[in-house]
Amino acid sequence: MHARVNPAGSAAGTDPSAARSAYYERIARLNLKPLWEVLAALVPPAPVTDAVPALWRWQDTQPLLMESGRLITAREAERRVLILENPGLAGQFTCTPTIYAGLQLILPGEVAPAHRHTQSALRFVVDGEGAYTAVDGERVTMSPGDFIVTPMWTWHDHGNPGGEPVIWLDGLDIQVVRLLGAQFRDGHDSDSQSVARPEGDALARYGSNMLPDGFAPRNGVTPIFSYPYRQSRAALFALKEGPRHRCHGVKMRYVNPATGGAPMPTIGTFLQLLPAGFSGAPYRSTDAAVFSVVEGSVRVELDDRRIDAGPKDQFVIPSWYRYRLHAAEDTVLFSFSDRPIQLALHLWREHEGDA
């Protein structure tokens, strides 16, 4: 007589859960897993993330950064940074699942030694004057609001010959490069790389609505590495009285002048103006974004919480979180995300409104 089998595939009279558990234990020893047990989690109907909205207040981070300057030198640390770790991603040293962010301090007289790595990096100057970043043989003086690019595998170092501490926001694609198994880093023979070009050379050569005759873009990386805030701010305020986006106010994206694309292949960067009295419509997108308040203050309304951020504060909005921006005064926000990756893979989505 043959055993009668029910539709679930187990013999009549037996406990299917016990049979399945025994089966799962057997296949686990062969490094096999049943997809049907995890399919809903692996392929959800909408984005799911462990990251949560979070705020880092300048009144908290600035004193702690200065304390770090008394505890360890820039040379000892190589990069003296306090990581903005998302509380939903504790222990992962990251702000979003794909974007690392941190606040870096360099004191007067210090040099953060030259190195290079396969991760692309950005610097957004938050506080202080007189420091510099050197990238690929050219130095640029750093001022608050400046956006600076360190392309992958280019030598870069930082120094502060000025008289005051300088703090900037770092953003890197560390998690993306780690996921791809392509992490490399190399130290320079000297603390400071040799300067081969005068300051402003790249900006004049590639950022003046012209390109050198015969120039060919390389690797999708911007040929200029400094985007001065004075120019970017002037553009925003020139557009203040014109049409504005109902969710973002006046929002502009930084571009590679050679291609019109993002300055870096993996990180998109943006600057936006919320005019005084602005109350934005609800918005969400698949790229989680890190924000820095440059001027003014902003109230961010999310479905389950509110963030009130002022000058030099940083905050993060995870993927597919619906939010609204409100500003009582003219407010400028810098932000960055992994949007270029999502666009290249045809994954990026956005939605305006409540529905």
What are these regions (language model features)?
Residues 2-96, 186, 193-266, 270:
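A short, N-terminal "cap"/entry segment at the start of jelly-roll beta-barrel domains
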Residues 89-100, 107-121, 137, 259-268, ...:
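A short beta-loop-beta micro-motif enriched in histidine and acidic residues
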Residues 135, 141-162, 168-173, 276, ...:
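Conserved metal-binding segment of the jelly-roll/cupin
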Residues 107-144, 150-154, 159, 284-311:
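A short beta-strand-loop-beta hairpin characteristic of the jelly-roll/cupin
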Residues 104, 272, 315:
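Conserved GNAT-family N-acetyltransferase fold
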Residues 104, 122-124, 149, 163-182, ...:
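A short hydrophobic beta-strand segment most commonly corresponding to one strand
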Residues 258-260, 267-273, 283-286, 296, ...:
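C-terminal structured domain segments across diverse proteins
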Residues 148-205:
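Contiguous mid-protein beta-loop-alpha structural module that forms a pocket-lining wall or clamp
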